[in-house]
């Protein structure tokens, strides 16, 4: 079992134990404090993950390419999301997939680039991928995602309350609570993947606005499609239910549309 799965199981078990304990202590009105506690936990995780959880699963080192590091810092300043550090993640220990992301808030914010991306991509492509991630921050997607998660756990708590009420205090009802959670996840999945794809398109557009580099955009997403084994033409139902990102052909078509809009605006 990986450490990530062990942590997920531990957090789930803690949440269930807390839920049962609250239902026993406050049988008539456990839902309100439970919803508040779960919402606070979702908020806390969004703050703690970059500085506490990520180092448990990955090793980080400074980016030794001083020129590229300076360019990425300048890009972050241009996006309005200045970063403290530019780090390299040792992703190659586990995968060949290439990635980058921006983690942390305020003084803990940093750009993280996987060593696989540095090995496989040109500096221009690395800048483009990082610009995409900075676009998520510029568009406030992390904050919106946190708010969405908080609303989700509150809604799930209220559904469990409506279905089980005081029976949640019975530990034998825990499997039913898990089943309700699974059902709610499946029901909400199409909406969540739709939102995710929309945010990815906005971040793609931001990457073009920040870099103005169409060639790097095209080559980066073609390279990522090959490296990450992306499905170029998934079945529509599968796409609607499971795909959190637009397909590579959609992303390239969006680039052409953006370029056309830019030319027409001049």
Label every model-predicted segment.
Residues 169-188:
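Generic long, charged, amphipathic alpha-helical segments
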Residues 1-169, 190-266:
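Polar-ligand-bearing catalytic/cofactor-coordination segments
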């Amino acid at each position: 079992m990986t450490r990530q799965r062990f942590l997920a199981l531990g957090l789930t078990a803690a949440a269930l134990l807390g839920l049962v304990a609250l239902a026993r202590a406050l049988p008539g009105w456990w839902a309100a404090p439970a919803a508040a506690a779960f919402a606070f936990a979702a908020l806390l995780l969004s703050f703690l993950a970059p500085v506490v959880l990520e180092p448990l699963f990955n090793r980080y080192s400074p980016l030794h390419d001083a020129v590229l590091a300076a360019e990425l810092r300048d890009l972050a300043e241009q996006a309005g999301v200045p970063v403290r550090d530019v780090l390299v993640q040792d992703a190659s220990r586990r995968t060949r997939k290439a990635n980058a992301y921006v983690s942390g808030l305020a003084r803990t914010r940093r750009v993280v680039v996987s060593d696989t991306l540095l090995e496989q991509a040109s500096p221009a492509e690395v800048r483009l991928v990082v610009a995409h991630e900075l676009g998520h921050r510029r568009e406030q997607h992390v904050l919106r995602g946190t708010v969405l998660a908080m609303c989700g756990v509150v809604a799930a708590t209220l559904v469990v309350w409506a279905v089980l009420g005081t029976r949640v205090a019975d530990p034998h009802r825990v499997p039913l609570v898990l089943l309700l959670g699974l059902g709610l996840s499946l029901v909400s999945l199409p909406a969540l993947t739709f939102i995710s794809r929309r945010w990815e398109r906005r971040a793609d557009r931001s990457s073009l606005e920040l870099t103005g580099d169409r060639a790097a955009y095209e080559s980066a997403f073609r390279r990522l499609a090959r490296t990450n084994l992306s499905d170029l033409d998934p079945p529509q139902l599968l796409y609607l239910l499971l795909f959190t990102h637009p397909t590579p052909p959609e992303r390239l078509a969006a680039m052409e549309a953006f370029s056309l809009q830019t030319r027409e605006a001049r």
